[in-house]
Amino acid sequence: MNVDIIILAAGQGKRMQSNLPKVLQPLGNKPLLQHVIDTCSQIKKSKLHIVVGGQSKLIQSFVKAPRSTNWVLQRKQLGTGHAVKQTLPSLRPNSCVVVLYGDGPLVRIKTLKKLISRTSGDNLSLLTFEASNPKGLGLSLIHISEP
């Protein structure tokens, strides 16, 4: 199965109070985004689509991505859904699509492979976690209605 991996890296990270975008902040000896790229590059039959904003040249100069990486410019930062929408023309038909944040370096290859293996056909798999204090985090509101 082909896997299209969308990595969202267009945010400016204003709250970081740094000259570097949030995805370029270091963790260990490399930028947050590089950790995500390195993990995703281990997925077979995958193609990376990295959505970047106004600092695209800076981001591309900081990280090492596979040659086949599709760098997608989000001209106006209009949210997560809009960022994903920018990649739609480049996604392969019938591929499994995985969306990740470029500032989320702790996702493990084992977790991604398990998520991908559970996604088939028209099904949707969503990887979330329960936070003890969700303040300041994006929320997933899930309502399951019985048929």
Language model feature labels by segment:
Residues 139-147:
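Residue-level detector of conserved catalytic or cofactor/ligand-binding positions
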Residues 20-26:
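Short glycine-enriched, charge-decorated loop/helix-capping segments at active-site entrances
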Residues 1-18:
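N-terminal nucleotide-binding beta1-loop-alpha1 segment
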Residues 18, 104-105, 118:
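Short, proline-centered helix/strand-breaking motifs
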Residues 8-9, 51, 99-101, 126-130:
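Short beta-strand segments
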Residues 30-102, 106-114:
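Conserved N-terminal catalytic core of the sugar/cofactor nucleotidyltransferase
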Residues 110-135:
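Conserved donor-nucleotide/metal-binding helix-loop-beta segment in metal-dependent transferases, i.e.
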